[in-house]
């Protein structure tokens, strides 16, 4: 269910603006999206896992807040991010 450190490092490298950039909204959204996708796959086999579902909803909400922030600050950056991640809006 969680992402491997290698995959996390790959996402950071792919979405970071510069070296060592782990806290930018783009990186945070990319990591959250990966975790959300993994949890969604988990629910295909464990439909009644309500404790994990709550965590999923919290992650989706946090991602939504970060995306709203990016959209408010820079519309072009927001559109580029959602197209790269394949998030529909």
From Swiss-Prot:
A molecular-function term among this protein's GO annotations: rRNA binding
A GO biological process this protein is involved in? translation
Please give the name of this protein: Small ribosomal subunit protein uS15
Pfam families in alphabetical order: Ribosomal_S15
Q: Which family does it belong to?
A: Belongs to the universal ribosomal protein uS15 family.
What CDD domains has UniProt attached to this entry? Ribosomal_S15p_S13e (cd00353)
Asked whether the UniProt record includes Ribosomal protein among its keywords, one would answer: yes
Keyword Nuclease among UniProt keywords? no
Q: How does it assemble?
A: Part of the 30S ribosomal subunit. Forms a bridge to the 50S subunit in the 70S ribosome, contacting the 23S rRNA.
So which domain of life are we looking at?
Bacteria
Look up and give the organism this protein is from. Answer: Parvibaculum lavamentivorans (strain DS-1 / DSM 13023 / NCIMB 13966)
Q: Which UniProt keywords apply?
A: Ribonucleoprotein, Ribosomal protein, RNA-binding, rRNA-binding
Q: What does this protein do?
A: One of the primary rRNA binding proteins, it binds directly to 16S rRNA where it helps nucleate assembly of the platform of the 30S subunit by binding and bridging several RNA helices of the 16S rRNA. Forms an intersubunit bridge (bridge B4) with the 23S rRNA of the 50S subunit in the ribosome.
CC per GO annotation: cytosolic small ribosomal subunit
> Which NCBIfam families does the UniProt record give?
S15_bact
Name the HAMAP family on file.
Ribosomal_uS15_B
């Amino acid at each position: 269910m969680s992402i491997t450190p290698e995959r996390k490092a790959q996402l950071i490298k792919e979405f970071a603006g510069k070296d060592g950039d782990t806290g930018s909204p783009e990186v945070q959204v990319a990591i959250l999206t990966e975790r959300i996708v993994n949890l969604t796959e988990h629910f295909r086999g464990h439909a009644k896992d309500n404790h994990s579902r709550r965590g999923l909803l919290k992650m989706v909400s946090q991602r939504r807040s970060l995306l709203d922030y990016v959209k408010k600050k820079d519309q072009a950056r927001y559109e580029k991010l959602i197209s790269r991640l394949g998030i529909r809006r």
